[in-house]
Structures are given as structure tokens and as C-alpha cells.
Curated annotation (Swiss-Prot):
Organism (species): Caldicellulosiruptor saccharolyticus (strain ATCC 43494 / DSM 8903 / Tp8T 6331)
Pfam families, alphabetized: TACO1_YebC_N, Transcrip_reg
Name of this chain's protein: Probable transcriptional regulatory protein Csac_0964
Main location: cytoplasm
Cellular-component GO terms for this entry: cytosol
GO molecular function, one term: DNA binding
Signal peptide residue numbers: none
């Protein structure tokens, strides 16, 4: 299996502050409510909801909080008009950037995203301008500290249909096709595994490095995008040097 992880190398590495964690919970809560309202509040019959629950758990959201958001969706809360939108563009130094958002006002969100790109040495492009540089894959990350038997983890991952397996310094990374992601994740959950990340992502086919000046701009671009209330995920092909 793969010994090198592109995913691990292009994550924007930093400890989240309490305020940032609170914003992540707020965004996940909205996603839980919208998916529960649109497709039903029962995870057994709503596979999209199961996937969002798994993502929330991987971000350390307590189960009672998760269920609280789902229950709110069954009430009078208005989730009409929300839609998923993907933006593509270039960061400083020609870094390819994909932004996934959930919004009930696409004009507002597009304007805000464009402003963030412009302010940090990038530019928002047309749909399809960079997505061809990425592969859509399921990504499941497990901490080695909790499951030290690498052979067992790899055996189970492959048994449930994983496409690739990588052993990194302190984590295992399991890659799946988008179609098999839920099956692999649910199989591993039944085996007792817990995850620090579990979702479908855009993984770059190749990565680029930046000068220190452009790297500082890129960090600001990522921070500002992630801080936007409508943004769910930011993907890029910048490989940050250690």
C-alpha cells in the first residue's frame, strides 16, 4: 500500500483555538440541521446524515450536541434555500484552491469569497478551472496511539473495501472511492475504530511549494476562508514545508 500521504502534507497544520472550534461546531450544526430537514432526521434511513454525523464526531462534537441539532431540524427551524456551492480559484504562487460552501444567498457568499481571494494575492476562477487537478476520495484518519496494531487496521480497512492505506508518523490514513466511503467507514465503526477525520475530500494529484512571502499570504487566505460562516471546507495543493 501507499507509503506516502499527499493528504497529510497539504493540511494547514495549526492548533485550533476555542473560538475556531466553536465556529467549526456552528458550521457542522447547520449542516446537520439542513441535511436532517431535507432528507429526514433518522440516520438509519438518511445516509447523508450518517456521513455528517461521522464528520461531527471526528471533530469531537459530543453526541448529545449532534442529536440536539438534529432534533432542532425536526422543529420549526427554517432551512429552506440552502444549497451546496463549490468555488475554484488560484492562491498566491498559482496554488490551486477549491472552496466548498453551504449558503442561502449565493450572491453574498460569492462576493465574500471573491474579496478574500483578491485581498490575499489570489483570484476566483471559473467552475472547473482547478478541480481537474484533484481526485475526489473518501478519507478516514485513525490515530495510531489508540490502535497500535498496524497490520490489523490495514487488514480491516481492506476487508471493508478501502482503496489505499498509508501509515504516517502518528496516524493511519485510509483512502476509499466516494462510492465506498460510507461502507468502509461504517464497517470500521462496527469494529470499534474511532476517527479524527472521516469525510469525502478533494485530494491534489500533485503539490507545489511557495516562497516564504507567498506562504504567509496563503496562510492568511486559508484562515480567512475557513473563518467565513458559509465555508465548509478548503482544499488546496500547497505543500507547506516543515
Amino acid at each position: 500500500m501507499s507509503g506516502h500521504s499527499k493528504w497529510a502534507n497539504i493540511r494547514h497544520k495549526k492548533e485550533k483555538t476555542d473560538a475556531q472550534k466553536g465556529k467549526i461546531f456552528s458550521k457542522l450544526g447547520r449542516e446537520l440541521m439542513v441535511v436532517a430537514k431535507m432528507y429526514g432526521p433518522d440516520p438509519e434511513t438518511n445516509p447523508k446524515l450518517r456521513d455528517v454525523i461521522a464528520k461531527a464526531k471526528a471533530n469531537n462534537m459530543p453526541m448529545d450536541k449532534i442529536m440536539g441539532f438534529i432534533k432542532r431540524a425536526a422543529g420549526e427551524i427554517d432551512t429552506t434555500g440552502y444549497e451546496d456551492i463549490t468555488y475554484e480559484g488560484y492562491g498566491p504562487g498559482g496554488v490551486a484552491v477549491i472552496v466548498e460552501a453551504m449558503t442561502n444567498n449565493r450572491n453574498r457568499t460569492a462576493g465574500e469569497i471573491r474579496h478574500i481571494f483578491d485581498k490575499n494575492g489570489g483570484n476566483l476562477g471559473q467552475t472547473g478551472c482547478v478541480s481537474w487537478m484533484f481526485n475526489r476520495k473518501g478519507v478516514i484518519v485513525i490515530e495510531k496511539e489508540n490502535f497500535p496494531d498496524e497490520d490489523f487496521v490495514m487488514e480491516k480497512a481492506l476487508e471493508y473495501g478501502a482503496e489505499d492505506f498509508a501509515s504516517e508518523e502518528d496516524v493511519y490514513e485510509i483512502i476509499t472511492t466516494p462510492e465506498d466511503f460510507s461502507k468502509v467507514r461504517e464497517g470500521l465503526e462496527k469494529e470499534g475504530f474511532t476517527f479524527i477525520r472521516a469525510q469525502i475530500e478533494m485530494i491534489p494529484q500533485t503539490t507545489v511549494r511557495l516562497s516564504e512571502e507567498d506562504a504567509q499570504k496563503m496562510r492568511r487566505l486559508i484562515d480567512m476562508l475557513e473563518d467565513n460562516d458559509d465555508v465548509k471546507e478548503v482544499y488546496h495543493n500547497w505543500e507547506e514545508e516543515e
